[in-house]
Amino acid sequence: MSVNPEFIADGIDFYPTTPDAAYFNAADGKNKVNRINGNSENLHHSFASGCRRSSLSVDFNVTSSDSEKSEQSCLENNSQEDEYFCDIFSTELKLDETSNKSTDYSSSNHQYPEQLELHNYKLLNKIGEGAFSRVFKAVGINTDDQAPVAIKAIIKKGISSDAILKGNDRIQGSSRKKVLNEVAIHKLVSKNNPHCTKFIAFQESANYYYLVTELVTGGEIFDRIVQLTCFSEDLARHVITQVAIAIKHMHYMGIVHRDVKPENLLFEPIPFYGLDGDMQKEDEFTLGVGGGGIGLVKLMDFGLAKKLRNNTAKTPCGTIEYVASEVFTSKRYSMKVDMWSIGCVLFTLLCGYPPFYEKNEKTLLKKISRGDYEFLAPWWDNISSGAKNAVTHLLEVDPNKRYDIDDFLNDPWLNSYDCLKDSNSNSYASVQSILNDSFDERAETLHCALSCQSEKQDDTEFSRSESSEYIFMTEEDRNLRGSWIGEPKECFTLDLATSSIYRRRKNKIFFW
């Protein structure tokens, strides 16, 4: 098979500004980043200095026009996604309306041009930048809620322009339909799902699209890997379990993410509590709380997510180091591409470098297609056989033999030590023991554990009532257990009136 990969920047990615890892963006014509050096002695250094991957659509022997037509056809023919659009924009601007009006913010001399057409929010500072977008920390105007949010401003002229040729790299803006698809899916999957970044609002003006989401205060899991080199098995399990719960929630609804990677995992920070007054090691794992500063983990960036029809998709896309082999070797692929990506993430968490790395792109694709990776010494010497077994089942080249999401959540290693355990309890509530409960019960068990130590620090009745949220799931939705098969009969909804109620702690926000 002849593979001729080309990379197409999707143009609406979140590029966080961090001092810990180098990356290049498509705006500078450098959308290809340095790959990990094949010399195993330099693995961690290479990963830290040049391995940040932007979200790229990977086009393997598929013309951009054919790929675009395929995606557009699926969107236009999918009445349920049209319903999502109607639901999202019912209280916002209509799809065909734009506005040249500026916000009512008093100053006319704005620091950021994006502020001129933005309503109801004040941009405070830039926290990220992409080829056709910038991300800002912002606060609401004329509202009692002053909690900061993240706003991604996507410039229209950037995403509607024709393909721009940069040497051998082809950079193409995303269509308006793709932006609306991202918004629709983000709103749907984040509803009552604590492990996806929360969608707040969407605005469209004459020159920009604005996506308003929650501000996740800890940063990327990628940066913690760079800082800590690698995670302990307990900490890796703590992170990957939450990622799996987020993917489970999406797969319930027939949605595949297609870009799971450390750069797309954010976390809420937790403080370090030393023993007997001594500061603990930064990467030490605390039962029921977390470690490495990592508490609640959230999946972000739904620009490549898609609601599947007939349980399969055919558009090749993703981030090459984390993309499953069938994406570029088969005509169609299933939700199990997310499981491959989870395997790549778990591998990276445990040893500090990804399973597939190669300077030459064709060689890299061949390695992925063969599942050619190794548990190299010394990084894997002290990692348990259970962890290696979980990785092996996730990085199975044959998708029919690969773990699905339920297989992974039932994996013995994932259940051998429980990051969901409440440290007040002497018993373990393992993932396996609660799989027969609803999604929100599993998530709530985790939140109870994560919040336990915070509750001890601030145990007043006022703080408990003011800093809590509720997670809901209807009794009718309990039949969604197990792997998703077929199209949902109706939109996946969680109804307040008929739900079981679960309370979780929400930590106060301190950011940048």
UniProtKB/Swiss-Prot annotation:
* Broad class of enzyme this protein falls into: transferase
Identify the domain of life: Eukaryota
User: Protein kinase domain spans which residues?
Assistant: 121-414
Q: Which organism is it from?
A: Saccharomyces cerevisiae (strain ATCC 204508 / S288c)
Q: Name one Pfam family in it.
A: Pkinase
One of this protein's GO BP terms? mitotic DNA damage checkpoint signaling
Name a GO molecular-function annotation: ATP binding
Entry EC no(s):
2.7.11.1
The segments labelled Calmodulin-binding in the record are 502-512
Q: Which family does it belong to?
A: Belongs to the protein kinase superfamily. Ser/Thr protein kinase family.
InterPro entries, per this entry? Kinase-like_dom_sf (IPR011009), Prot_kinase_dom (IPR000719), Protein_kinase_ATP_BS (IPR017441), Ser/Thr_kinase_AS (IPR008271)
Q: What is this protein called?
A: Serine/threonine-protein kinase RCK1
What's in the keyword line of the UniProt record?
ATP-binding, Calmodulin-binding, Kinase, Nucleotide-binding, Serine/threonine-protein kinase, Transferase
Q: Which GO terms describe its cellular component?
A: nucleus
Query: Which residues make up the binding site for ATP?
Result: 127-135, 152
Q: Please write the reaction equations for the catalytic activity of this protein.
A: L-seryl-[protein] + ATP = O-phospho-L-seryl-[protein] + ADP + H(+); L-threonyl-[protein] + ATP = O-phospho-L-threonyl-[protein] + ADP + H(+)
The active site lies at: 259
